[in-house]
Amino acid sequence: SCYDLCQPCGPTPLANSCNEPCVRQCQDSRVVIQPSPVVVTLPGPILSSFPQNTAVGSTSAAVGSILSEQGVPISSGGFSLSGLGGRSYSRYLPC
């Protein structure tokens, strides 16, 4: 067969010396490789919301105290209170 070892060159010498090259070309082999199934995971959509508390035309100072208890600074620019009982015309409150 193609993969047999090279034949010895001539009669067996007293010393191991041989100058004949031993090269053998074998036929090409064909191997069919079936592709394995590939699972691709696509990330799902990221849903986010930005709720905003809105107080418009509040005349009560209780709104300011409730907001300050919840950690919302009154002087943040989104809410203004002009004195106790004063009118405040604000459009939005920071979250």
Curated annotation (Swiss-Prot):
Domain of life: Eukaryota
Keywords: Acetylation, Keratin
Residues modified as N-acetylserine: 1
InterPro entries: Keratin
Gene Ontology molecular function terms on file: structural constituent of cytoskeleton
A single Gene Ontology CC term: intermediate filament
Quaternary structure and interacting proteins, as annotated: The avian keratins (F-ker, S-ker, C-ker and B-ker) are a complex mixture of very similar polypeptides.
Family assignment from sequence similarity: Belongs to the avian keratin family.
Protein name: Feather keratin B-4
Organism: Columba livia (Rock dove)
Organism lineage string: Eukaryota, Metazoa, Chordata, Craniata, Vertebrata
